[in-house]
């Protein structure tokens, strides 16, 4: 029987097998749902505003009040933060597998309920929607640490970064599909329920059938994740958790034998090292030992993720406001309610296809060649430069309202929407081929097995607190500015400074490329020291540790 050290070596040295790809799909579908549910709301908030907050005395389409808009877009992020902390801790206490199914069930259930938000008044509809989206976010939050840690503990040493990045890249696919589904559903409804634009007829421009559009869009995200529920439940516990945390080395071997090539396990089983992790490194999260070993690491992962998400979510959640002013979408009064969803989602889809998704997959293919550290540094730096130019030249890129002729479909004219789109696209590309991916990957590698999920959850929660700053703080600042153009310019330039801070905080995070998880976390030294002490003790007593003396074929811990 292979020892637990042999199992860990087997995992690190295993060739890429079909099960690795299956694990990517299973974990990745959770992230597909995560991204879809968090970002599809951007495509439909303006529709909800037209449906529930229209004012007949106002000569412009209905919009969500700033506080309501912030609540709808930000409440899921609050739930996500809570879920990351809770399920991250629970994943270390109960095991990755036991908790994994709970997060998926929560996501699927509350994604469906979000589309069934009920009430006869705007207040009750929005309240029920926010309630369901908070708990949707709670489930999404649990998927962050669990998916990252499961993939890192299953993966081999050579391609671990690419595998974790591939799981996270499904976030990009989720953003793309969110735009695609909203575009398809709105186009379908436009064909069957045409209506004049707002300027032609303010009342008829808001089709009552639009109430089905936003509900269908919100509910669709549950479908792909639900299809993977069976396989998620069939996944065995990771060998690293079973061996290093539970101390059940025999079961770790049996579990991995089910999913990995048995020949690989037998080839690696001739090690004679038996590890006793619970005795050799029992320091806790709040101990001075953890602070000495990993305090700066945790500061680095939390600070960089926090700073990144301020900028990333500010851009993603304000797309609905940025696109019309940049000339990528018609002004609201020149569209009916469902057409506005189509225009916004088409812009979202195009930007995701050209900039967002390629950034994720560049990380997948290049992370093991360039390394996490360099990708994160380059990403933060390019984001900072692009956003500085975008903010500094915002008015010239946007154009002027006075330059538009009567009957123009655009809010601003004589700007430079092409240059705006290029800089905006580059920012998103280098966010994803940069810190948005690496801040997810590195916390799943840096910390010891029994604290790995907790520390990833803490890092991710720090990121979501940054996202909340973006969703509530940045959006409120722009929304409450007397001169929205000036407010947007100042906000974008401030985000450039935030990215620059992320660049410098990256130096707190070490490179993890090309090393085993046990070497990175320091567990390997603990194992070696523990076994050396046991061997010396055995020699003093005239005997040697049984797990060292026995032949590999009969050694069992």
From Swiss-Prot:
This protein's record includes keyword Magnesium: no
Subcellular location as annotated: Cell membrane
CDD domains xref list: MFS_PhT
Record-level Gene Ontology MF annotations: hydrolase activity; symporter activity
SUPFAM superfamilies (UniProt xref): MFS general substrate transporter (SSF103473)
Catalytically driven reaction(s): phosphate(in) + H(+)(in) = phosphate(out) + H(+)(out)
Phenotype caused by lack of the gene: Normal arbuscular mycorrhizal (AM) symbiosis with AM fungi. Plants missing both PT4 and PT8 fail to establish AM symbiosis with AM fungi in high nitrogen conditions, leading to premature arbuscule degeneration (PAD); these phenotypes are suppressed in nitrogen-deprived conditions in an AMT2-3-dependent manner.
Induction remark: Accumulates in roots during colonization by arbuscular mycorrhizal (AM) fungi (e.g. Glomus versiforme).
One Pfam family it belongs to: Sugar_tr
Renumbered residue ranges of the record's region Disordered: 519-557
Segments on the Extracellular side according to the record's topology features: 42-70, 120-130, 184-210, 316-346, 391-414, 479-490
Keyword terms, alphabetized: Cell membrane, Glycoprotein, Hydrolase, Membrane, Phosphate transport, Symport, Transmembrane, Transmembrane helix, Transport
GO cellular component: periarbuscular membrane; plasma membrane
Positions annotated with a glycan in the UniProt record: 406
Keyword Membrane (UniProt): yes
Residue ranges of the TM segments: 21-41, 71-91, 99-119, 131-151, 163-183, 211-231, 295-315, 347-367, 370-390, 415-435, 458-478, 491-511
Parts of the chain on the Cytoplasmic side: 1-20, 92-98, 152-162, 232-294, 368-369, 436-457, 512-557
Its membrane topology: Multi-pass membrane protein
Biased composition (Polar residues): 543-557
Other noteworthy facts: Although related to the sugar transporter family, it does not transport sugars.
Family: Belongs to the major facilitator superfamily. Phosphate:H(+) symporter (TC 2.A.1.9) family.
Role description: Low-affinity transporter for external inorganic phosphate (Pi) that may be involved in the acquisition of phosphate released by arbuscular mycorrhizal (AM) fungi (e.g. Glomus versiforme and G.intraradices) during AM symbiosis; not required for mycorrhizal arbuscule development.
Xref: PANTHER family: SOLUTE CARRIER FAMILY 22 MEMBER (PTHR24064)
Listed name of the protein: Low affinity inorganic phosphate transporter 8
Source organism phylogeny: Eukaryota, Viridiplantae, Streptophyta, Embryophyta, Tracheophyta
